[in-house]
Amino acid sequence: MLYNLLLPHIHNSHIANLFHYITFRSGLAIIITLSLSFVTGPILIKFLRTLQKNGQPIRLDGPESHQTKAGTPTMGGIMIILSSCLATLLLADLTNKYIWITLFGFISFGIIGFMDDYAKVTKNNHYGVRGKSKLLLQGIISLIICILLEYTDKNPSHLLNIPFFKNLSLDLGYFYIVFAIFVIVGSSNAVNLTDGLDGLATVPIAFTAGSFALISYLVGNLIYSNYLQLTYIPNTGELTVLCAGLVGSCLGFLWFNAQPAEVFMGDTGSLSLGSILGIISVITKHEVVLSIVGGLFVVETTSVILQVYYFKATKGKRIFKMAPLHHHFEKHGWEESKVVIRFWIISVIFALIGLSSLKLR
C-alpha cells in the first residue's frame, strides 16, 4: 500500500525513493512483523487462554515430559498470519499477482488449520478434522493456485529445474500441475509434522523463508538471474518482501514459543507456513531446492512414512521408538531443548547446502 502510494513521488522525495528498493522494504517488513508480534503476542495469548480452558490436547502416548505442556493454548499461528499479511499489504506492490495468489494460499491453508485446531480444542482430543478431509481441502486450494498461476502467465513453464547442474531440467508438461499440487500439500504437511516441540519448527521455517527471500530476489532480477544461470521470472522480486515478513513474524512468535512455550502455533500456523513455502518454491521454479533448504521437514516426514509402512509390513514392529524423528530422540533420553537446538543446527546446514546450489553448477 505504501509502495503504491509513494511510487509517483520517488523522484521528488528521498524517503519515497527508499520504498522503490525491495531490500529496504524487506528490512522494514522484518521490523514491522517483529514489532507487531511483540505487541499483539501477550494480548492474543491471553485471549486464547480465555477461550481454551484446557489448551491443546496432549497425546497420552507421547513422551512423559509433554504432559507438563497441558493447558498451553494453541492457534498461535494467527499471530504469524496477521503480522505477515499486514506487513505485506503495507509494503509490497499490490499490483503484483504473485503477492495476491500467495496470500490467498497462505490464508486458505490457515483457515484449514484453524478448523483443525478448533476441532481438537472443542472435542478435547488431538485428532481434529479427519485427515482425508484436510487433504481434500488442501488439494482443492492447491489446484486453484496452480490454475491461477497457469492462466495468468502468458508463457507458463512446466520445467522442473535440477539444482547443481547447468541447464538441466525436466519438461513435465501438464503433469507439472499435479507435481506442483504435491509440492504445496507436501510442504504444508511436512512442516505440520515437524511442529512437535517448543520452537522446533519456527526457526527452520525462518531459515527457509529467508533462503527464499534471496531466491525470489535473484530470480526476479534479470542481471542476477542471467549471471547465476537461473530461470528469470519477472515480478517475483516482490515475494522477497513477503518472505522477509515471514522471517520477522516467526522470530517474533519464537519469543513466546521458546521452551517452555506460552502458546503453540497449532495447525493454524504450521499448515499455512508450510503451504506458503511450497507456493513460493513453485512460483520461483525452485521446488527441488525447497526439499534441500527445508531438508529437516523432509527428514521428519520420511521418518513418519517409514514408521507407518514398516509397522504395517512387520505387523507391529517399529524402526523408531516414536515418530516423527524428534520424538525418537526424546524417547532415547535427550532433553527437549537439546533436540530442538540440534535440529536447528541441522536446518542451518540444509539451508546452506540449498543456497549453494544457486552458484555451484
Curated annotation (Swiss-Prot):
GO BP terms in the entry: cell division; cell wall organization; peptidoglycan biosynthetic process; regulation of cell shape
Pathway listed: Cell wall biogenesis; peptidoglycan biosynthesis
Keyword Membrane: yes
Reaction(s) catalysed (UniProt annotation): UDP-N-acetyl-alpha-D-muramoyl-L-alanyl-gamma-D-glutamyl-meso-2,6-diaminopimeloyl-D-alanyl-D-alanine + di-trans,octa-cis-undecaprenyl phosphate = di-trans,octa-cis-undecaprenyl diphospho-N-acetyl-alpha-D-muramoyl-L-alanyl-D-glutamyl-meso-2,6-diaminopimeloyl-D-alanyl-D-alanine + UMP
InterPro entries: Glycosyl_transferase_4 (IPR000715), PNAcMuramoyl-5peptid_Trfase (IPR003524), PNAcMuramoyl-5peptid_Trfase_CS (IPR018480)
Keywords assigned by UniProt, alphabetized: Cell cycle, Cell division, Cell inner membrane, Cell membrane, Cell shape, Cell wall biogenesis/degradation, Magnesium, Membrane, Metal-binding, Peptidoglycan synthesis, Transferase, Transmembrane, Transmembrane helix
Record membrane topology: Multi-pass membrane protein
Keyword Amino-acid biosynthesis on entry: no
GO MF term set: metal ion binding; phospho-N-acetylmuramoyl-pentapeptide-transferase activity; UDP-N-acetylmuramoyl-L-alanyl-D-glutamyl-meso-2,6-diaminopimelyl-D-alanyl-D-alanine:undecaprenyl-phosphate transferase activity
Co-factor(s): Mg(2+)
Membrane-spanning intervals of the chain: 28-48, 74-94, 99-119, 133-153, 168-188, 203-223, 236-256, 263-283, 288-308, 338-358
EC number: 2.7.8.13
Predominant cellular place of this UniProt entry's protein: membrane
Subcellular location: Cell inner membrane
GO cellular component, one term: plasma membrane
Function: Catalyzes the initial step of the lipid cycle reactions in the biosynthesis of the cell wall peptidoglycan: transfers peptidoglycan precursor phospho-MurNAc-pentapeptide from UDP-MurNAc-pentapeptide onto the lipid carrier undecaprenyl phosphate, yielding undecaprenyl-pyrophosphoryl-MurNAc-pentapeptide, known as lipid I.
Record-stated family: Belongs to the glycosyltransferase 4 family. MraY subfamily.
Protein known as: Phospho-N-acetylmuramoyl-pentapeptide-transferase
Species in which this protein is naturally found: Rickettsia canadensis (strain McKiel)
Recorded name of the encoding gene: mraY
